[in-house]
């Protein structure tokens, strides 16, 4: 594989249940590069779950931490998976310009199926289906804004999504 194909980070964005962590890890393995997940780094460094941070500190504090860690990880090579709401930050959206950003697009039915109705995700408490629909609608334009490529994940396995990203990476060069 050409070194040109793996230089600079490949960034994965998408809503809850789009497969960011699974696809990101598989893609990094396929490319032989490091995989970093912003949410996992937040949990590791804080020693608390995302839900605990939301509950104890509030969403604005979590978003500030997410923005800070995204900015720290974005220059590193490999594959970087952002949290579903990272694109809410104008600073993060601006920082993504010039990077290869893949939006893993997921529909409501698949998102609910993958996330589950009994979820510990802080923004999905209560009516999971309704909250997911709201998130998908509110964030679609922001995902579209940052994406260099849109990958539909609804009817594809994680391995098939990785294949589509690999083909798109070659086409982008």
Task: Enumerate the predicted regions with their spans.
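Hydrophobic anchor at the beta1->P-loop junction of P-loop NTPases
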Residues: 12
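ATP-dependent small-molecule kinase phosphotransfer cores
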Residues: 37-86, 90-95, 120-121, 129, ...
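Conserved lysine of the Walker
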Residues: 20
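Hydrophobic positions on the alpha1 helix immediately C-terminal to the Walker A/P-loop
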Residues: 23
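NTP-dependent small-molecule kinase module
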Residues: 1-5, 26, 30, 138-173
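Conserved phosphate-donor/acceptor-positioning beta-strand/loop module used by diverse small-molecule
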Residues: 96-118
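Short glycine-rich anion-binding loops that position phosphate/pyrophosphate groups of nucleotides
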Residues: 84-87, 107-109, 156
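P-loop (Walker A) phosphate-binding loop of NTP-binding proteins
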Residues: 15
């Amino acid at each position: 594989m050409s070194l040109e194909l793996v230089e600079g980070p490949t960034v994965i964005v998408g809503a809850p249940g789009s497969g960011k962590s699974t696809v990101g890890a598989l893609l990094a393995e396929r490319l032989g590069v490091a995989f970093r997940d912003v949410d996992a780094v937040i949990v590791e460094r804080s020693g608390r779950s995302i839900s605990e941070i939301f509950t104890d500190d509030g969403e604005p504090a979590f978003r500030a931490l997410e923005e800070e860690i995204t900015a720290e990880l974005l220059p590193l090579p490999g594959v970087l998976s952002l949290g579903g709401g990272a694109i809410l930050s104008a600073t993060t959206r601006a920082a993504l310009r010039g990077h290869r950003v893949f939006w893993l697009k997921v529909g409501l039915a698949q998102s609910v199926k993958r996330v589950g109705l009994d979820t510990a995700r802080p923004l999905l408490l209560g009516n999971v289906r309704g909250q997911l629909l709201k998130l998908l609608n509110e964030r679609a334009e922001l995902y579209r804004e940052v994406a260099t490529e849109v990958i539909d994940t609804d009817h594809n396995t994680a391995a098939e999504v990785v294949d589509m990203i690999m083909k798109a990476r070659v086409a982008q060069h």
